[in-house]
Structures are given as structure tokens and as C-alpha cells.
Amino acid sequence: MKKTQLLSLLFVLLFTFIGAQTTTFLSEKTNQPLPKVSVFGKDGTIIAYSDIDGKIERNTLNPSQEKFQLVYENFSLGTFSYAELNKDVVKLNDRVKDIEAVVIKNNKPAKYVLIKGNFNAYVTVNGKLNCYVDGVATYVFDNKTKKVKSTNVEQYRIYYLETAKNDLKQMGSWDYSSSLEFPKLRDVGNIGEFKSKKLKIKELKGNAKDEVEITGQALQQKEVAFFGYRLYDIKSILNISYEKDSKKTLRDFIESNEIYFMKLKHKTEPQYNQVISYRNFYPTELDFSDKNDVEKVKFDKDISQYKTNYWQDASFPNMQTIFSSFFKEDLKEKENKK
């Protein structure tokens, strides 16, 4: 082998090794991987999010950030230095709160399964928060097919950043409030449905729950152009949690976390903008009923609608407090029209 070829091979191997370096988050108490840990930079950008194996790419950690805040299960685990995270394994004290038991109100077989719970959803652009919503909603499932029949929001509040704009040619500063959506909860009662599709599936059996991660992607090699916009690199990651060692039915369902990625720009913008949508749902009640009429309001994304301070409940997934700690007065709530 020629010297130049040997050097080329060595460089390829070197860069492959460097690019593949990861940090794995483990539970300090169970020594098991911690998925869904968000790593915040000092400016409030979300720079990494651990996969089902508890891993993040090491190259997402920039030494210039100096301090990073880790958030797990909607609670801050504290502030960490670059040196503390620049390791193969980082053990975290994750037992912030116990898993809330889902209250089963009725065990009698019926036409519908009603699952009530708390949700939050938010959109980031190039890692920075753009808009946020949380609230209380009830999903109605067909008890025979286990498919979602309707999504009914009971109350909610929406936040936006004052710095967001509505310039159609600036996707990096666009206000994405109109794109806020609820978790879809697609096939959470038929987890086997995912196995028949061309998706990557991984499972993690933890001490307290079983988790399933489903990953899909599209437009990896080419962009799509429409009305002056460019769309590229679409990806989704669904993480669904069930009772430990359960059959993974609707009765066993305890949490859903959905993340949708895409790169978007106007044709006049030099670089793509990384847009990420996070959608999370945490069941609190399960009921069986032959009626599917539930309390709901119209989900108007220009206002908030609530009658109670539901977010003050200790079990509520209140990410708004995390974001407010970074963005202060710039994070504004839309007017409550109760």
C-alpha cells in the first residue's frame, strides 16, 4: 500500500473515531441508561438530547459554553461543567420524582377508552426555544382497534418569544406558534404495528418501566422545494413508556415523548435552519365508556384558555419554568380567554 493511501486510511479512521465519541448518561442509583436527558447551553439552547441508550454525541458539547444544565423528566438535574460532561460515562442523580400511577376509573369493557393526562409541546429553531404550550387533554381511543378517535384539550396556555418575527423570508426567526401540535399517540395501544414498517426500533427494560424507541427518517439525500422554500433531512423519534414487564397495552401506557426534526430555509437564506418539535404526554386517568363526549375547548393558538392553575400541581410537567429561567421577560404568555 502506498504511503499516501495509508495516510488517507489513517485520517479516515481517526475522524471516524473522533466523530463517534459519545457521552453516556447513567442512573446513579440503578446504573441503567437515562434516555431523554436534555442538555441546555448557558444561553438556553438545547444542544443535545440523549437516545434510548442514554447517549449524546460528544461533539455537541462546546467548551466555550463552560456550563450546561441537564433536564430530565421536566426537572433540572443541576449545572455541569464541560469537564464533568466530557467523559465516556456520566452518572446522574435522576430520582427526582416517582412515576405517578394512572388512576383507572372503570374496569368494565366499553366502546371507548378515554385517557386523560397532562401535556407539553415546544418548538426550537437552531436549538433555541421559539414557542411553548402545555395543558390538560383527553384522548379517546376505539377500544377495538386501539386507534385514536379524537384529541380533546380541556385547558392550555401558550408562550412565545418576543424576538420571533413574521418575515416569510427569515425561517430562522419565524414565529412557529401556529405549528404547535399535541402528541399524536399513534399506535401506543398497538406497539406491534411499528414492527411492520421500515422503522428502527429499540427497547430498554428499566427498573421502573419499559421503554420503546421508534426512529424514522426521510429526505436524507435530497431536498424538496416548494413556493420558494427548501425542506431537507426529516426525522422522527418516538419514545413510548409502559409499566414494567407489561403487555404494552393502553392500560399499561404511562408516557409518550415525540420529537420531529426538519431542516428548513427560504431560498434566499444561506443556511438551513434546524427546526425541532417536541411533544410529550403523561397519562393521569384511564376510563372505559360507551360515550365519547368529553370536556373540551377549541385549540386556538393565538390565545391561552384555562380556568385553573393546573401547572401548579406537583406532578405537572412544567417545562415553562425551565425555559423562563433562561429567557426571563422575553418569554410571553398569550392572553388567557377563559
Model-derived segments and spans:
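Surface-exposed, low-complexity/disordered segments
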Residues: 88-338
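Short, ordered, surface-exposed loop/turn motifs in non-cytosolic proteins
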Residues: 29-43
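Short, acidic Ser/Thr/Gly-rich low-complexity loop/linker segments typical of extracellular
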Residues: 45-55
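Hydrophobic beta-strand segments
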Residues: 37-41, 68-69, 104
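Bacterial Sec-dependent N-terminal signal peptides
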Residues: 1-24
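A short, solvent-exposed loop/turn motif at the edges and junctions
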Residues: 69-80
